[in-house]
Amino acid sequence: MSNRSGYRGYIGSRPYFGERAAQHVQNLVIRDYCQRNGHPYLLSATEYAMNGCYMMLEEVFRELPRLEGIVLYSIFMLPRNRDRRRRVYDTVLSSGAVMAGALENLVIRNEQDIRVVEDIWVIKLLTETRTDKIVV
Amino acid sequence: MTQNLERSPFWTDEEWTLTQSFLDQGYVIARTESPDTLERIRTHVAKAACGHLGLDIPADAGKFLDDIAAHVDPSTLNDLRLAVINALRSADWFRPAYLALARQSLQTLVGNELAMQRGIGLSVQLPQDDSSLLPIHADVWDGDSSFEVVQWVPLVDCFGTKTMYIVPPSEDRAVQKTMHKMHDQSAEDLYNAVAEKAVFLDLKFGDILLFSQTLMHGNRINVEDTTRWSMNCRFKSIMSPYAQKKLGEFFEPITIRGATRIGLDYSLPEDFDE
């Protein structure tokens, strides 16, 4: 029998791609995802507000051997740097856990899933616009 | 945190002493301004816990809360915590009572037009329980504004690992300045970097802690024999900047003064012809 138990939520304190959701709303989305998928939900870790900081994600990695998975509020909370994202995927999958994005209802269990998420990420980066630069 | 603050002649001695202490340490601990109110809150908490657990109301609420581990374990703790929080939040007297515990100190440190966190937090930390830990953090890293103060109220005596720790301003600022170098490390690594400097705050029931949540703080596994019960709530000046914790969804204005009320409602006469 597995010693793993539950899915740790992971929410943010800063905007991602210029978008912000209140923390209790992020938690509602994660709870709903876990409920719909029959996953035991564990109270979320909250990432620090500083851009480029993933120390709370690293903290969650420390308990990966005891977790079934991590549920991010959104896959766009992952690091913007491709190599750092790759390290996140590798860390989670090599530990035997899975990772999900609750908002997008996407789960990463294997290389194929990573490709799907990476395609979305690359397109998002390419199409990223700043509304303050749009001239009408 | 702010060095060489010169005393303005507008400060009273009492205000100046409190402010200096707050700036030097990043926190102040004072006896509650309303002991009866604090006792009322603690009794309400104990009754709510008894109601949830199906127990008789205890004669000594403090001892009952200290020894709550006789009635719950980590797997049932969160249900108890939620039941007590719901009982507090549904009592319409509770939030004004919470303010009354340190009203004068808050007015000195924060201002007299206050915004108050809408949902007051409750921590219950059983002995040896590793499921209720709060990793090292500063609330400003979690979306709070640097203009806020946390009012932390113990419902039992808190000491040793039963209490929270805080990192003193000088060490805190030095570490925050170079924190980016720890970008691929965890919060636990960060704690290890400041552990020797962390101060575990000794508070008796009746003490109120006001601290700047720009300072790193958190808790560790409670290895004392009794359970920690504490409440926390953030206050800020209504007109000071907000971060991710917004007015309305997180904060509520509670003491809008008359002149501000008039100012908020007033608009200049309009529709003059040029």
Language-model-detected regions and their locations in the chain:
Chain A
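Short, structured surface patches at the beginning of a domain
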Residues: 1-136
